[in-house]
Design a protein with these regions (language model features):
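Short, charged amphipathic alpha-helical "coupling" segments at sensory-output junctions
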Residues: 1-13
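PAS/PAC or PAS-like capping segment
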Residues: 71, 128-130
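Short loop/turn elements at sensory-signaling interfaces that couple input to output
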Residues: 104, 109-124, 128
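Short coil/loop residues immediately preceding or within conserved phosphate-binding loops
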Residues: 36, 91-93, 104, 121
């Protein structure tokens, strides 16, 4: 089992990779009952939406579903389960709104489900298309 320090080092390494992505990067636990909690959010993800890390965590209670516009939940969640993941990967991006500090931003998102140590996660990118 990995320690918190090992996980932290892994996320720091991930941040170095995420800095090379033109959009924002996020990773969520595959836990729909708890709103798909964020395991990781890149600095660029926060920058696109205008949030500081501390206010983002407080505002959304670390839940992906709290960030998605209520009318867009179907689009924002369509790839977030094992049954849809393979189909989603073949069909391309999803377009929906995420709540930014100054209002909703339209984003294009590409994501896939991965397993890590037996747990399911959704990893994805967002690009601002507002």
């Amino acid at each position: 089992m990995e320690t918190d320090e090992t996980i932290k080092k892994g996320f720091l390494r991930l941040e170095r990779y995420a800095q090379n992505i033109p959009g924002g990067f996020h990773c969520c636990a595959e836990d729909p009952e708890n709103g798909y909690p964020f395991a990781y959010v890149s600095d660029r993800f926060l920058e696109i939406l205008g949030w500081e890390r501390a206010e983002f965590a407080a505002r959304f209670d670390n839940r992906y579903t709290a960030l998605v516009h209520p009318d867009d939940l179907a689009a924002g969640l369509r790839y977030r389960n094992a049954e849809n993941s393979a189909t989603y990967a073949k069909n391309g991006d999803s377009i929906f709104r995420l709540l930014g500090k100054n209002g909703y931003r339209w984003v294009s998102s590409a994501a896939n489900r991965v397993e890590w140590h037996g747990d399911g996660y959704i990893v994805g990118t967002i690009t601002d298309i507002t």
